[in-house]
Amino acid sequence: MKLTLFAAAAMALCQAQAAEPATSGDLPTVIITGSMPLPTVEQPRDALAAPVQTASAQQIARSGALDISAFLRRNLGSVVVNEVQNNPFQPDVSYRGYTASPLLGTPQGLSVYLDGMRLNQPFGDVVSWDLIPRMAIESLTLMPGSNPLFGLNTLGGALALHTKDGRGSPGTAIEARLGSDQRRGVEVEHGGSNAQGWHWYVTGNRFKEDGWRDDSPSDVRQLFGKLGWSDARTDIAATVAHADNALTGNGLQEQRLLARDYRSVYTKPDLTQNRSTLLNLTGKHQAGEALLLSGNVYYRKIDTHTFNGDLNDESLDQSVYQPGAAERAALAAAGYTGFPASGANAANTPFPKWRCIGNVLLNDEPAEKCNGMLNRSHTRQENYGFSGQFTALADLAGMRHAVTAGAAFDASHATFRQTSQFGYLNPDRSITPVDFFADGTEIDDDGTPVDNRVDLSGRMRTWSVYASDSVAFNQDLTLTVSGRYNRSTVRNRDAITPGGGSGSLDGDHRFSRFNPAIGLAYAPAKGVSAYLGYNEGSRTPTAIELGCADPDNPCRLPNAMAGDPPLKQVVTKTWEAGVRGKLADVARWSAGVFRSENHDDILFVADNQAGFGYFKNFGKTRHQGVELALDGKAGALDFGVNYTWLQATYQSREVVNGSANSSSDADAPGLEGHIVITPGNRIPLTPSHIVKAHVDVQGGRDWTVGLAMTAVSSAYARGNENNQHQAGGPAYLGSGKSGGYAVVELNGKVQLTPRLSIFAQVNNLFDRKYATAAQLGATAFDANGNFAARPLPAVNGEYPMVNATFYAAGAPRSVNVGVRYAF
């Protein structure tokens, strides 16, 4: 009997609608709809040679998650979140040690798709989670490994998001919430359809909070709309999404200052303003009983401004306290009063400013005497493209083939401009600017112009062709073979130093590669299946990585870049194997192993100055581990538990800068030095153990209560790549790692009427103090929180630094309540 695509889709739809656990407790078949970026034939999860994880809109809503990243952290196995920015909408989402982050300077290893459109941005491959409206998401699929069908940057996995439409989400709903730290938000959604085949859906969101850390407000505004038309064979939809957000995330804090005041910030502000507009036209058409055509055309524009108050680390080894005679004369002539005539030092002048102002007036050395800096950047990005594919079903020699083949094109243009203005640090950690910029007008002691300006434009083009054949030999055995060829060109042009040569960012780069994949899924018995898979993926270096690869010229990202030799593209090769099954239609279980090896991995290596570092190709790294999972439903009880053992290690020897590391080869503690990475050293920010568990109880139709726990083991700090740092002496403070932690969330919902419900959530129920990430670096403060230049005696004319561990502190306990009205 022939099975048409239309019948397959209808059957899959019925099963997908049953994917929410039935009241009888039977477990439905899980259908995967996101095995490729574009629509294709839905497949049972057991037919895929990978431990795919999925979630529905109902599951996302029940979790109480603020956004998609929060849901991933709470519910999906092998996922951890590093709160480097300490803003709920700016997390680093890490899966198996591969990251999707909004921060330039974080090596990216995950690709994210929305209705077939790649969300990784052209400049830096970053993912801005604040641009993804949670309420618009109908389902998500997390595909593991370096699956080539998801294109560039799919080194460790791919997240495919699918949005709602008016057919599946009819009606209107209004949701409002209030919470700790002045958190307040309103979401509205409306969907519908008519007999003529038209369907529509729209949702809007406004969210504001003061933030749990000092001076850390955020304002999020999101709008999403979809208009479509469909009949028995065709479905076309046009999507528009707009966001206009202002996010303050004040980043890492030094360990002693964090112990004094958990809500304190190192310096401020750290403001990111994102404005984005996305247009996406998608379509699929059943051209015959066994042929499905699908494709999309898209356009996106993103405008990002950043404004950061930072320490000028060049001042830490300078005499910045007592102004000299010429400086005092200049201050007096300019009308200043109150500056010290003599005797100013660290003890009586905890926040010096007069030498900074005096050197600006004299146009002498403000780059060394001013201890603050205001960094501003502006990034404009546009990208557009299209993709198209066909899926054909055929029976050949008694075997069912599902063949998919397609092509894609993506083009982008990005401009990045940055300026740095000097200033001085205030007691509240803000920076007062002075009239002097790092624009090359001052020459430092080495004879190099002090110039942090960047004016870079880049164009990137990527052509891709891909194909996949899933062969069902019988009901028990499925073989899938696929591959993708990518060809990318990158053209960078430097408006400040054009023409190439030393210091220029000009460059023309070309990258190409064919990435294969093969997988086998076998079901030897009812309720039990096994899989084995191998795949390869690659990513090209981004403009910011190509421009910041010199250890002698580290960058404060995204605030500085320098012309360097081009980096190589990263190639990842992944093996997967595992078994899975059901327990008496009450629970699903799975056990698997994986190994991913990155060749020419691009790593960010920390410099001794906090926030500074550089990119470099590293010979080989390895991510391997074991994953165990159990989830199910027994009566009113819904439960799940995941465990991951992860070993992310370097597999090559390398010498890198390690001045903040106690094991460096520095001539004396606190001076500049290097460390040696050897095979087997663990990669920073990757924990060895991840445990997640949740229990939800359904009290009839009226109420639900849930408890979730996430436990993560310790991880090494950036700057401690050799895993040898030890606290000791006045020059090295802190362990060089972040400790393990466990946090618990409690949420509940009460259905007051068929239309009205209330809900509440308590995050970090036991108010644990913990850190999700760490970095080694020189600190500018003493134990009392006062600025301290030249904190240690000179050694052969050089002043050692006090180096500390900086932590990304986890949010304290917070309570959020809300109400939802649907009609």
What is the role of each PLM region?
Residues 387-392, 474-476, 586-599, 614-721, ...:
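Gram-negative outer-membrane beta-barrel transporters
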Residues 244-260, 489-496, 508, 521-575, ...:
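Surface-exposed extracellular loop regions of Gram-negative outer-membrane beta-barrel proteins
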Residues 286, 292-298, 302-310, 523, ...:
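Membrane-embedded beta-barrel scaffold of Gram-negative outer-membrane proteins
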Residues 178-208, 213-250, 269-292, 482-484:
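Transmembrane beta-barrel wall of Gram-negative outer-membrane proteins
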Residues 538, 710-723, 749-823:
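C-terminal beta-signal and adjacent terminal beta-strands/loops
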Residues 28-63, 89-93, 110:
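N-terminal periplasmic "start-of-domain" segments of outer-membrane beta-barrel proteins
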Residues 33, 119-121, 130-173:
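A beta-strand signature from Gram-negative outer-membrane beta-barrel systems
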Residues 373, 400-525, 642, 655, ...:
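Signature of Gram-negative outer-membrane beta-barrel scaffolds
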